[in-house]
Every structure is written in structure tokens, then in C-alpha cells.
Regions:
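N-terminal secretory signal peptides that target proteins for export/translocation
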Residues: 1-6
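Bacterial N-terminal signal peptides
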Residues: 8-20
């Protein structure tokens, strides 16, 4: 081949290699931000400043989003529609200070590693990572490697870890058998974690997810639990300042006819389908700075089920609905020294406001995952539409929801 022909060929080859490499690098999520409240959808309770799990002091969230390729599926090549979400309960500054936690499985057709030790010890160590079903193993190993490189040994001098890594299945849009999530993608999600406002929708581990047969993914919401609410009926009781409770979901569950938004059966009004049967899952994380012990956090995790049910889910046989709750209170409670220590605890009798906040924030987080999203075309040109904003607003208006479109309900005697 002549030099004249070689030069353009080499240039083209180099360009293709650069494009292929860049396509597999973490990419930013779309800049559009339209949340449920922006559409006038009413929710009970008062959200925090960011209406996100990051309203809980110390909590940080980071993403790696991987999108590349189009057309026919070629296993190992793509198309790629996946990613990683990392949640750091105490942030990077206190990575080696475990938090009290509680775990609950509503339906166990899924995986969340490390929960046997959470159940046994009551502690959650290090970041929580969310990804796709077939990347759990590499994500778990990557978390351990990252902690070894950036953390320190425990109080006994051992460097060991049982990370919490959870999954939902993105194989309708993503080359899930191609193992595109690499250790560096997990590291990027951890290292990019931050407080403040966070992205939602098709981002991080939620990139290729489908919820109620609309484009799903990552959603979040928060609630402020006022001091008066946790002080009980005795107004003279001393109580701390307000507590924060936040929820983050990776939403990949439900059939379209089930979708319910503030009592309105939205899914039945917008026909369409993706699956022949439910194949999805949902991971729900609940974080709070209220001083709760592991058994109380397990109770909190259970209440996420009620928020999920508000959106219409019945937690089908094929759905992996796994929930974990943690508290950032009681720092250093896991330290070996001193041998006896004091911790703070909220009485069980005062937990109802936290239960309410969990249900409310879970419901809103799931709807946010649907609203702050966009259509996506994935493997084999599978197309999943986002929930149409204008149609949703039209439905809410048509059914004349009182108090910004809240549904009217029958009482126990069947009267309106």
C-alpha cells in the first residue's frame, strides 16, 4: 500500500479507536431537570432543600453513566446502556466509620450483597453501590479494591470488607451479558460522589432501567421531620432540631396498567407495553440522621414497601424488591475502644413521623425517576418512552384533583 493510501487509512483507524474509547468513558447525564413537583404533582410532607437523599447531612452520591453503540445486539460490544451509582452514607471523609443499618426483602428475586453481615452486626460498612444484574460481582470486587487503596485497616489491623452491592436488570436496553462495567467505573462513581443536588432518571445504575413500562432509573426525594413531630404529645418534652430523611431508588419495576400517581391510575390512561410479564426490580435506600438502632432501621426499611405500593406496584414474582435503611447518627459506634460506650436512640413510640416520611419520600422518589427522564433506544432498537409530561398534566386536570389535583376518596360508607 502506498504512503498516500496509508496516511488516510491510519488517520481513519486512529479516529475510530478514539471514538470507541470515548464512547465507553463515563458520560454526563442530560442537563434537563424536570421533577414531579415542577409539573404540579402534589405530595404530602415537607421536602428538604434539595429534595434528595443528600439532604441527610454527610450523605454523598456519585454516578458513572455508560452509553454507547446502537442497533443490533453484539454481546461484548453493545449497545451499552448501563452504569454505576455509589451512595456514601458518611461521605468520603468518614468512609471507615460504619453506620447502623437494617435490611428488608419485600420480594427476593434479586441480589444485594453484604446483607448477611448487616443483619448479623447491625452495621453497614463503606459505600452502597447499585448497578446491573450481571455486574454485581465486579462491582463488589471493585469496592473492596478501592477501599484497600484509599482506606485503612479496622481496629484489629485487618483490611477486609463485605460491601453492599445491589442490582436491577437492564437487559432490554443494555448488552447486560457484555460485562461493560469495569472497576474504574465503580471507582469513578465513588470518587465523584458529592452532596447537594443530584441527577435523576437515566443516570448511573439507573441508565438502562424501565419502570411501569416507561423509562425508569434513579430517583430521589426527602422529608424534614420537625422537632415537634418527634417530641410526642408533651409539648414540654425536650427534643433535638429537625431530622432529615431521604430516599434513593433504582426503579425498574411494574407493568404500565399498575402505575398510579397520587391516586390516579395513570398507566391505564396511557396505553402501551414493553414486556409480556413483569421482569423488573427496585432497590430502595432510606437514609436519616435520626438516632435509630438496627432493629428500628429494619422497621423503616419495611415502610418503603408502602411508598412503593402507592405508585401501584404489587411486587410481582419476578421482581427483586430489596430495601436497606441506615442512620448517620452515633458516629464511631463501631469502634472497638472504649469497650463500653453510650449511644443515642429514639424511642419506638416516637417513630411514626419517620414511618410517614419514609412512605412519602419513597413514593415521590419513584415518580421523580419517571418524570426527570427521556426516551431511550437500546439494543436491537428497543425503544422505551418516557412518561409524557403534557399528557400527565392533562390527565390530572381532567380528573380535577382537589388541592393541586389530589384525588377524592370514598369514606368507609362508600360516600364521597
Amino acid at each position: 500500500m502506498s504512503d498516500i493510501l496509508r496516511s488516510p487509512f491510519r488517520l481513519l483507524l486512529s479516529l475510530l479507536l478514539v471514538l470507541d474509547a470515548s464512547a465507553r468513558e463515563p458520560i454526563p447525564a442530560p442537563t434537563k431537570t424536570v421533577r414531579a413537583r415542577d409539573l404540579g404533582i402534589p405530595f404530602d410532607g415537607a421536602p428538604g432543600k434539595f429534595n434528595a437523599i443528600t439532604d441527610v447531612p454527610g450523605v454523598e452520591v456519585g454516578y458513572t453513566t455508560l452509553i454507547s453503540g446502537e442497533g443490533k445486539l453484539e454481546v461484548g460490544k453493545g449497545p451499552v446502556r448501563t452504569g454505576v451509582t455509589a451512595i456514601l452514607p458518611r461521605g468520603r471523609a468518614a468512609m471507615n466509620d460504619p453506620v447502623f443499618a437494617g435490611y428488608f426483602s419485600l420480594n427476593g428475586n434479586g441480589e444485594m450483597t453484604g446483607t448477611a453481615w448487616v443483619e448479623e452486626s447491625g452495621f453497614l460498612e463503606g459505600p452502597i453501590v447499585l448497578t446491573n444484574t450481571h455486574s454485581v460481582g465486579i462491582a463488589r470486587d471493585a469496592v473492596i479494591a478501592w477501599r484497600l487503596a484509599h482506606g485503612g485497616p479496622d481496629a484489629e489491623g485487618f483490611a477486609w470488607s463485605l460491601p453492599v452491592v445491589a442490582e436491577t436488570w437492564d437487559g432490554w436496553l443494555n448488552d447486560v451479558d457484555g460485562f461493560h462495567v469495569k472497576p474504574e467505573h465503580v471507582a469513578h462513581a465513588i470518587e465523584s460522589a458529592h452532596s447537594g443536588p443530584i441527577e435523576e432518571g437515566s443516570v448511573g445504575g439507573g441508565t438502562g432501567m424501565i419502570c411501569y413500562e416507561f423509562k425508569g432509573g434513579t430517583g430521589t426525594a426527602s422529608r424534614i421531620v420537625p422537632a415537634a413531630a418527634v417530641a410526642g404529645r408533651d409539648s414540654s418534652a425536650q427534643s433535638p432540631g429537625s431530622y432529615f430523611l431521604g430516599v434513593l431508588v433504582q426503579a425498574n419495576c411494574g407493568r404500565r396498567p399498575q402505575l398510579t400517581i397520587r391516586g390516579l391510575e395513570v398507566g391505564k390512561k396511557i396505553p402501551g407495553s414493553v414486556y409480556k410479564q413483569e421482569t423488573g426490580s427496585i432497590i430502595i435506600l432510606v437514609g436519616t440522621d435520626a438516632p435509630l438502632l438496627p432493629h428500628q432501621l429494619k422497621r423503616l426499611a419495611r415502610r418503603a414497601s408502602l411508598g412503593l405500593a402507592r405508585t401501584g406496584s404489587v411486587s410481582g414474582n419476578g421482581s427483586g424488591d430489596l430495601f436497606i435503611a441506615f442512620s448517620t447518627a452515633n458516629a464511631h459506634a463501631a469502634d472497638a475502644k472504649p469497650p463500653i460506650r453510650s449511644i443515642e436512640i429514639m424511642p419506638n413510640d416516637l417513630m411514626d413521623p419517620l414511618f410517614t416520611a419514609t412512605v412519602e419520600a419513597t413514593e415521590e422518589a419513584i415518580i421523580n425517576a419517571l418524570i426527570d427522564n427521556h426516551d431511550m433506544i437500546g439494543r436491537d432498537n428497543h425503544n422505551v418512552e418516557a412518561l409524557p409530561h403534557e399528557r400527565l398534566q392533562q390527565l390530572l386536570k381532567e380528573y380535577n384533583r382537589p388541592r393541586a389535583n389530589l384525588p377524592r376518596r370514598r369514606d368507609c360508607r362508600g360516600k364521597w
